[in-house]
Amino acid sequence: MFFPAIVRRLGILCAISLLAAAILAGWTTVIPARAQELDIELESTGRLMPDVGPGVRAIHRDSKGRYYVLTAPGPSILVYDRDGQLYRHIPKEPSKTTGIVYGLDFDMDSEGDIYVADRGTDTIKMYDSDGRLARSIDVPAPNSIAALPGGEIAVSTTTSRHLITIYDANGNRLRDFGDFVHVTQRPDVNRNVNAGRILTDPSNFIYYAFSYLPEPTVRKYDRTGHAETELSLQTIEFEPEAQARRRYIADQEDNSKPVPLREVINAIGVDPKSGDIWIAIDDELVHYDRDGNRKGLTYRTFTPEGERLVPISILVDPDRLIYACDPAGVYTLPRPDMRPGVAPEKPEEKPAPAPPQKP
């Protein structure tokens, strides 16, 4: 269900206050008109897989409609049927060598093979469609993973000098791409700010969502590393916090201690048919079409009981969104683009041009 966010969010009044503060502060940022619109509450239609809760890391669906869920720590991926009933584990009987120690992310290819980024062993574990461990390759500090055709895998790590590294099925590094955004002079902090998550679509485009960049940003690459589009949310609803984050990071320039960072983008999902992109910033949800045009409003997501939903993974089904939230669990939400009479969905903002790649 959709409800104007009047009680839980001040909406227009808040936007007007922020706009006034921006003007008084002398900001010169151009404020898009959509930033002054009223946010819409998006209420979950119910919970799936009630045994999934704290530690959930990612969710995927196969061609037969089965759902695969990764939790950490946990030795196996949980497999559920279309009705949300658990019926299988991958691997079926995990051992010290075949089990998952601390999986941060996973993906599936078109053949049903599964790839797990296991931070606990600094490896990528590959399971065949029957759930057997096929092979394991060493990758230091894997953070996120996406399966590509021909057995290739795209990986983000916390040690690479690029955003994305492509490996072949045997663990050979094929290519690196994706330049960092320069935010601070401290190399360690700048590397952490550029950490992110990877996702692919059926057309084999690769999406990189910056987890900690002050401005919510997603880049879209083709599988060779050519940058197609960059989506950067620089509206009045996100700009004040982005400015505050940049000031906080700048204040740490002369500090040698580790700098804790708060997540900005916590999840993204891509519609496998349309290529539309859904981006979650805390409990807020925004929508772009495949060409990077902003669609509709900003949505605030809640459980039926009124608790905020902050996803760590988003699955886009034909008629609904599925949120995997740590620790809340897995919830279904209506797709606002399927309810145009209630929550208008229209193209709005054009994407920023993709940044040039360094030779």
Task: Mark where each language-model region is.
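Bacterial N-terminal signal peptides that target proteins for export
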Residues: F2-L18
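Eukaryotic scaffold repeat domains enriched in small/polar residues
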Residues: G26-P359
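Hydrophobic core
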Residues: L18-L24
